[in-house]
Curated annotation (Swiss-Prot):
UniProt entry keywords in alphabetical sequence: Carbohydrate metabolism, Fucose metabolism, Glycoprotein, Glycosyltransferase, Membrane, Signal-anchor, Transferase, Transmembrane, Transmembrane helix
Family per similarity comment: Belongs to the glycosyltransferase GT106 family.
Record: residues binding substrate: 412-414, 528-529
Organism for this UniProt entry: Arabidopsis thaliana
Gene (name only): OFUT14
Protein name: O-fucosyltransferase 14
């Protein structure tokens, strides 16, 4: 037993130094680790709770990638671009503001070029017109009115040139530069001062039982109205009541003029219709017909009284008889009427007979200045004695309000049957349409009227050509004619309500009235239709200083040979 114990003891003794050495190493390592943990804990106590630098250091250690420079740029550059795009408004950086002048330069250049060409054309036109004025004044002693008119046309043309040059530089409705309007007080086409205070008149105070039977046979309605006005003068001189002819012998005057209004204007009965005369004539009650005691002819040539057998037959059909032969107090030719005085008329046509007739006095030339003055030679309280009846006047006013307005030019463009009539005169008054259009355009330019009313008997082919040639400043000036009857239009309602529609004489008087109310009137030389319009304009106070005959002071640039 003792032997076994000895061997164990011996083994333990031999291993003891090595074990001590290992134990010592373990103790040192343990102490070292304990010291490290202690130091680490002390440092942790000294650091803030969220140490960013420590976190970044640990992240770098955790996520450290072995990337090259190119790889880094490839990865991070798109991210940077996306972030910048989301956080920045690029609209202000990429929108380019180009000045308006850059876009307008081409347009403005074109407008300037166009206006320069227009101004050059107008300057050449002005030069031509000035030469024409110069040549005209050298060869003729022009009146001051002609010179004023010509000068104004050039001023108007000069104004157009100014506007043409300034037009590219205008914006909106701004007017650049001055105006010459201030130099023309009252405008370029002022109303004519009729000086009514200086009228020379005669009192018409007829004897109630003495009558003058009007005989008007020459020409159309306008001739008859002028003839009727002269008959009024004769009736006033002879102190007689004037009998208006029957529509069965003459025109239907009661549809065109207001006969009762004439009596109102004078404050007494001075005119009666044929029907009224028939009722009150004392001879008719005895003999059952109207008797003309004396028939006096103003003209003896080419035939007495300008009355033929046909008219005598018509008078008899009315129940009118003529006593004795046609009487002629003097030698007077229609082709060459002489000037007569009021005293001569009174001396040669005075009679004690109850009913006398004088015919035809349309061509009579008695106290012309007296007869032609505004309002006529008879004293009255109206503007004129013979004027359209109230229905026609109102219809004309409604037409003007509907289609024309206040400022318009009226043109009486006589064509039918006028070519032969005018070419028999020297100079001729029948103008080619292009020449007529040129004359009309000049007046439109002067008046500055936006529209032209056309009273004409011309064919559509002629009026169509005229319309196409009426161009001012590149714009067509509209021609307005009375349209055909349309139930949708109400301006002419008064006429058809009173049964006057479709009457050619009513329509002619309506045309006259519209022309008489215009701002400026262009008439046809030699036409009594025009002369009656001028009479109305003079009496109504609508006459303008610019009123004229078509192409006045000009001759047709082409005249056909005679047959």
């Amino acid at each position: 037993m003792v032997k076994v114990s000895s061997s164990t003891t011996s083994s333990s003794s031999s291993s003891s130094p090595d074990e001590e050495s290992d134990l010592q190493n373990l103790l040192e390592e343990s102490d070292s680790q304990i010291d490290q943990f202690r130091i680490s804990d002390e440092a942790a106590e000294q650091r803030p709770t969220f140490d960013v630098e420590s976190l970044r250091s640990r992240l770098r250690r955790s996520f450290k990638l072995n990337l090259t420079k190119k790889q880094s740029i490839f990865i991070f550059l798109p991210i940077v671009i996306i972030l910048i795009y989301l956080s920045t408004d690029f609209s202000n950086y990429f929108s380019v503001k180009v000045p308006n002048s850059a876009f307008r330069s081409n347009t403005l250049t074109g407008r300037v070029h166009e206006s320069d060409l227009q101004a050059l054309y107008l300057l050449r036109k002005q030069e031509s017109d000035l030469f024409s004025i110069w040549n005209h004044t050298v060869s003729n002693l022009s009146t001051i009115d002609d010179v004023k008119s010509a000068v104004f046309r050039q001023i108007s043309l000069n104004r157009q040139i100014q506007n043409a040059l300034l037009s590219p530089h205008k914006t909106g409705n701004v007017d650049i530069g001055g105006s010459s309007d201030g130099y023309f007080a009252g405008g370029s086409c002022r109303k004519v001062d009729q000086k009514l205070n200086g009228r020379k008149t005669i009192q018409w105070k007829p004897r109630p039982d003495k009558f003058l039977f009007a005989i008007c046979l020459s020409g159309q309605m306008s001739n008859h109205l002028i003839c009727l006005e002269k008959h009024m003068f004769f009736a006033a001189l002879l102190k007689r009541v004037l009998v208006i002819p029957s529509h069965r012998f003459d025109y239907h005057y009661s549809r065109i003029i207001d006969i009762d209004r004439i009596n109102t204007c004078l404050g007494r009965t001075v005119v009666v219709s044929f029907e009224e005369f028939w009722k009150k004539d004392k001879n008719r009650k005895k003999h059952h017909h109207v008797h003309i005691n004396r028939f006096i002819c103003y003209f003896s040539k080419p035939e007495p009284c300008y009355v033929d057998k046909e008219h005598i037959t018509k008078l008899k059909a009315l129940g009118i008889t003529v006593g004795g032969k046609l009487d002629t107090p003097w030698e007077e030719d229609i082709a060459r009427p002489s000037n007569k005085t009021a005293e001569e008329v009174e001396a040669n046509f005075r009679s004690d007979d109850d009913v006398i007739a004088i015919g035809d006095v349309f061509y009579a030339n008695v106290e012309r200045e007296w007869v032609m003055q505004p309002g006529g030679p008879v004293a009255h309280k109206c503007r004129t004695l013979i004027e359209p009846n109230r229905l026609i006047l109102l219809t004309a006013q409604r037409f003007i309000q509907t289609f024309l307005g206040k400022n318009y030019i009226a043109l009486h463009f006589r064509r039918h049957g006028f070519l032969k009539f005018c070419n028999a005169k020297n100079p001729s008054c029948f103008f080619p349409i292009p020449q007529a259009a040129s004359c009309i355009t000049r007046l439109i330019e002067k008046v500055e009227a936006p529209v032209l009313y056309l009273s004409t008997d011309a064919a559509e082919s002629e009026t169509g050509l005229l319309q196409s040639l009426l161009i001012l400043n590149g714009k067509t000036v509209p021609l307005v004619k009375r349209p055909a009857r349309d139930s949708a239009e109400k301006w002419d309602a008064l006429l058809y309500r009173h049964g006057l529609e479709g009457d050619s004489q009513v329509e002619a008087m309506l045309d006259k009235t519209i022309c008489a109310l215009s701002s400026v009137f262009i008439g046809a030389s030699g036409s009594t239709f025009t002369e009656d319009i001028l009479r109305l304009r003079k009496d109504w106070g609508t006459a303008s200083e610019c009123d004229e005959y078509l192409c006045a002071n000009e001759q047709p640039n082409f005249i056909a040979d005679h047959e």
